[in-house]
């Protein structure tokens, strides 16, 4: 592997700007070599003056980069020292409180089950659990800083060695000895001391003096390129996907040759449509995960997942393929139910019952930690007013807005099994066309409209909760207004449908109101997608016209195509309304809804790429590379200690003014400036695609 590829794979993406501009230095050296005057046409003194002038500029740039690295390292080291003092203080407070309440001298002597503890003891137990997680994340941040230290030294050594090789001199090596090897970022070994002290604290105080158990908890995921998935996982993904494709072909043939023309297939389609959308969503989420990892978008940090244990794209493909096979087999069984002793209505119950059991399975199998994380997240989403709302909370609620058809089909299935299904007929899911009209697929009884509004309601109350926590009307109240338009759209659609069915004279009034609010909702959401969720149409976009100053994905064409796609699919309802209003084709609304529901899932899949890119750039602007986990707020003692650290000689230093050279594809991340950076200019660096490693 070339060093540039090694560097791209191992850097911390959120700190990308703060590394040495290795590729830029390489371009600088090669350009100087190519533009150097030839000794055949000019005298030797001219050539020497050219290279002397170039070296002066080269080493000045090296000094600026070295000052930048020293400053950033000092800032992060001071932050780590403050964080370690805070964690030690929190740990000591928890241990002291435990001694006072139980008389037990050390944590490892407690062995009572949690449900036997008093309220105060449960709080202390939870604090210790949070401390273990906090020390684990803190240890990861130390390793990242140590990796930053080592990589930058290696980069300096490599680029100065290349300088000497191209210019046939030894001044690069001399400069490295005189400047880099005595630089604070390289000579300071306090990071190693912090790592050792953290290991000792976790071993002695939190893990019963067991070093193996402590290091297992502190284990750092690989900081290099993504590790290949286990061979059996890859095999299962290929096997499941192959079987799924074959079964889909079989389904099409069975539908053509086995279904009777006098039977209505719509109850069957509505019941199985939601399962297909869920499988499509999982598969596309796997592609999202792969794309984020390849582009260096740290989705593990954004969702605050455990970097040591989370699902990769391979696992998501595996789950989607497995559920897809079950979905196909269940639907095929319905087609061939007439020659079976099992009625058709049993198969959907078995399929969805298995899916629910797979999710809530209490045993520690089948991705237990990931399933438990999802269940906790769903609970937080549905109880949004009572919790602070994080990124993962409102991200999942946004996904539910694109999966509202699943909720509506679930409501239809419950209603159909309760009121319309002929339990005494084996082909109950394929009723005769001549039977009495449907009830469950209409708005007339009111429940369907309420179910359709549930996802928008969840996001609406999340926005209100965020306004309560931040007291910021913009963007939270404005965002709540966006989701409130869904309530009006669904309400007028339901009123139009019921009044049209009953032949009321005011039907067209509700139709026009429905159209008006559809236009308002689509324009509102489209503008919010482009400007707020994706951060596009930035006035400081520079060469990235209509986009933003910083872009992560390699081609600007991706962004322009995405804008067009979002406009088309946000206004796809115009096609649906036009066809259903102007045609007498039976079930035209069902046909259009069945076509457009997967397209909405696809639109959300594309939206995910750029929404997380925007959040990732926010993390880059704050240099946030690990989760922020704390048991207690910073107290006065810790604040005093922090101030002392900042006053030390190895604390934060003032940055020197510097203006880096510019390249065609660069980022300049805006962020709140530290006091030490009040007069510093933003640093631009060349972007390379990186794989942000997260073990599974």
UniProtKB/Swiss-Prot annotation:
GO terms for cellular component: Golgi apparatus; plasma membrane. Residues 260-264, 338-343, 423-429, 504-506, 586-587 are extracellular. Residues 158-165 are annotated as: Important for inositol polyphosphate binding. The chain crosses the membrane at residues 229-259, 265-296, 310-337, 344-365, 389-422, 430-471, 473-503, 507-534, 554-585, 588-626. The modification Phosphothreonine is found at residue 690. Its main location: membrane. The modification Phosphoserine is found at residue 668. Residues 648-696 are annotated as: Disordered. Keywords: Cell membrane, Host cell receptor for virus entry, Membrane, Phosphoprotein, Receptor, Transmembrane, Transmembrane helix. Pfam families: EXS, SPX. It catalyses: phosphate(in) = phosphate(out). Phosphate binds at residues 398, 401, 482-483, 570, 603-604. Residues 366-383 dip into the membrane without crossing it. The keyword Ribonucleoprotein does not apply. GO terms for biological process: cellular response to phosphate starvation; intracellular phosphate ion homeostasis; phosphate ion transmembrane transport. Residues 1-228, 297-309, 384-388, 472, 535-553, 627-696 are cytoplasmic. It is a multi-pass membrane protein. The record marks 573 as: Gating residue for phosphate transport. GO terms for molecular function: efflux transmembrane transporter activity; inositol hexakisphosphate binding; phosphate transmembrane transporter activity; virus receptor activity. Inorganic ion transporter that mediates phosphate ion export across plasma membrane. Plays a major role in phosphate homeostasis, preventing intracellular phosphate accumulation and possible calcium phosphate precipitation, ultimately preserving calcium signaling. Binds inositol hexakisphosphate (Ins6P) and similar inositol polyphosphates, such as 5-diphospho-inositol pentakisphosphate (5-InsP7), which are important intracellular signaling molecules involved in regulation of phosphate flux. The SPX domain plays a role in the regulation of phosphate flux. Inositol hexakisphosphate (Ins6P) is bound between two SPX domains of the homodimer. The SPX domain has high affinity for inositol polyphosphates and its affinity for inorganic phosphate is two to three orders of magnitude lower. Homodimer. Belongs to the SYG1 (TC 2.A.94) family. This is Solute carrier family 53 member 1. It comes from Neovison vison (American mink). The gene is XPR1.
């Amino acid at each position: 592997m070339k060093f540039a590829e090694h560097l791209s794979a191992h850097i911390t993406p959120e700190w990308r700007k703060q590394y040495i501009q290795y590729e830029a230095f390489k371009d600088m050296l090669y350009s100087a070599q190519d533009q150097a005057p030839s000794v055949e046409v000019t005298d030797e003194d001219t050539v020497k003056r050219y290279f002397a002038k170039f070296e002066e500029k080269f080493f000045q740039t090296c000094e600026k980069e070295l000052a930048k690295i020293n400053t950033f390292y000092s800032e992060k080291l001071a932050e780590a020292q403050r964080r370690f003092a805070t964690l030690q203080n929190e740990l000591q407070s928890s241990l002291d409180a435990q001694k006072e309440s139980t008389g037990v001298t050390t944590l490892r002597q407690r062995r009572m089950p949690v449900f036997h503890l008093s309220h105060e003891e449960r709080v202390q137990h939870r604090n210790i659990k949070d401390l273990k997680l906090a020390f684990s994340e803190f240890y990861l941040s130390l390793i990242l800083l140590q990796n930053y230290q080592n990589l930058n030294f290696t980069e300096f050594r490599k680029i100065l060695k290349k300088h000497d090789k191209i210019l046939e001199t030894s001044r690069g090596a001399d400069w490295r000895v005189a400047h880099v090897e005595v630089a604070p970022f390289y000579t300071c070994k306090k990071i190693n001391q912090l790592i050792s002290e953290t290991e000792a604290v976790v071993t002695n105080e939190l893990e019963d003096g067991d070093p193996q158990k402590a290091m297992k908890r502190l284990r750092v995921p690989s900081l290099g390129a993504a590790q290949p998935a286990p061979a059996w996982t890859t095999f299962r993904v290929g096997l499941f996907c192959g079987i799924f494709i074959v079964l889909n072909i079989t389904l099409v043939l069975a539908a053509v040759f086995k279904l009777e023309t006098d039977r209505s297939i719509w109850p069957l389609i509505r019941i199985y449509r939601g399962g297909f959308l869920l499988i499509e969503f999982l598969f596309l989420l796997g592609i999202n995960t792969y794309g984020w990892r390849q582009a260096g978008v740290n989705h593990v940090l954004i969702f605050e997942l455990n970097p040591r244990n989370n699902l990769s794209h391979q696992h998501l493909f595996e789950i989607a393929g497995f559920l897809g096979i079950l979905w196909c087999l269940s639907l095929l069984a319905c087609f061939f139910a007439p020659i079976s002793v099992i009625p058709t209505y049993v198969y959907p119950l078995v399929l969805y019952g298995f899916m629910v059991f797979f999710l809530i399975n209490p045993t520690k199998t089948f991705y237990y930690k990931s399933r438990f994380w999802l269940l906790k997240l769903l609970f937080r989403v549905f109880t949004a007013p009572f919790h602070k709302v994080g990124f993962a909370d409102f991200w999942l609620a946004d996904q539910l807005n694109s999966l509202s058809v699943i909720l509506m089909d679930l409501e239809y299935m419950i209603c159909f099994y309760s009121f319309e299904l002929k339990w005494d007929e084996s082909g109950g899911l394929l009723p005769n066309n001549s039977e009495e009209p449907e009830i469950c697929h209409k708005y007339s009884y009111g429940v369907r409209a309420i179910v359709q509004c549930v996802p928008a309601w969840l996001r609406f109350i999340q926005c209100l909760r965020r306004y309560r926590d931040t007291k910021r009307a913009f963007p939270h109240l404005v965002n709540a207004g966006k989701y409130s338009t869904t309530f009006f759209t669904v309400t007028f659609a339901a009123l139009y449908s019921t009044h049209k069915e009953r032949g009321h004279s005011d039907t067209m009034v509700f139709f026009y109101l429905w159209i008006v609010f559809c236009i308002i909702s689509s324009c509102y959401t489209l503008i919010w997608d482009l400007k707020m969720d994706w951060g596009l149409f930035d006035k400081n976009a520079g060469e990235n016209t209509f986009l933003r100053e910083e872009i992560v994905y390699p081609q600007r064409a991706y962004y322009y195509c995405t804008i067009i796609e979002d406009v088309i699919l946000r206004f796809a309802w115009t096609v649906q309304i036009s066809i259903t209003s102007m045609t007498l084709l039976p079930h035209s609304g069902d046909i259009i809804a069945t076509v457009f529901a997967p397209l909405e899932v696809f639109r959300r899949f594309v939206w995910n790429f750029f929404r997380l890119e925007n959040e990732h750039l926010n993390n880059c602007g704050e240099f946030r590379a690990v989760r922020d986990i704390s048991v207690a707020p910073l107290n006065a003692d810790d604040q005093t200690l922090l101030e002392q650290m900042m006053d030390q000689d190895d604390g934060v230093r003032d940055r020197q003014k510097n203006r880096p050279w510019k390249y065609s594809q660069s980022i300049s991340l805006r962020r709140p400036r530290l006091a030490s950076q009040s007069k510093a200019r933003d640093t631009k660096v060349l972007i390379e695609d990186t794989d942000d490693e997260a073990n599974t």
